[in-house]
Amino acid sequence: MEIGVNVPNFGPGTDPGRLRDWARTVEGLGFDLLMLSDHVAITPDVAEQYPAPFYEPFTALSWLAGITDTIRLGTTVLIAPYRHPLLVARMAANLNQLSGGRFVLGVGAGWARQEFEALGVDFAQRGELTDELLRTVRDAWTNDADYRSGDIPIWVGGLSTAGMRRAVRFGDAWHPLRQSMDWMRNALGVLAKIAENEQRALPAFSPRILLRLTPEPLDERVAGEGSIDQVIGDLNQLEALGAEAVVLDPFIGDPAETERPETAWSALATVMAHRGDK
């Protein structure tokens, strides 16, 4: 099972030097994936969770590709309705080629209503627009040589039944974000039923989970939260459930965290040290 990191490409203190330090730290610790989030307009609803500055993921990942060697690079997740499908197909193909085949395209439908309004995109149509993007990107990569650049895995986010159906229809992997172990275990059963009804192969399971280490175990928590033993237990359970990859998200929610990445780096190092003891 691969383990990746959702690197904060936003917030106070984030600049090219900080992104470079993140990339070198994550690759140096031996992680398999480095992934970035996506927002275009930092409207109030976005800023509450992801404050400015915000580095556009394709741009930032292209730069990070040049200062990393082997770590895979991806989006968790690109908000599909914000960009023309053919632009995404070309940017993804170009980035995959420039990085030596290391790109993973994670896609989601989005949630920030004010951001949709600022961009002139119909929030109510976000599911349909996401389906259309995935359909168009797949078609461009398959049928137009100008867009081809090796195999690019598509991870589809979404927690609803519609999101799971989208992952079955268009994705190489289903990429749920920040849920409990019980929720994911039950949802995998739903995903399998959807795949059966759609008469399609079951996509891989590649969740993104929180990473928050606490001195003592927690009773109520989501996956990736609690003592190091609890977090390692979650990773072991996810591996037993068949997870192909797990992305750790060390951003807890305090904007000041992006100014002090050393805490996150320490947590990531602790996880890798304990995983190495398996």
Q: Would you name each region that the model predicts?
A:
Residues 1-278:
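Active-site-adjacent structural elements that line small-molecule/cofactor binding pockets in enzymes
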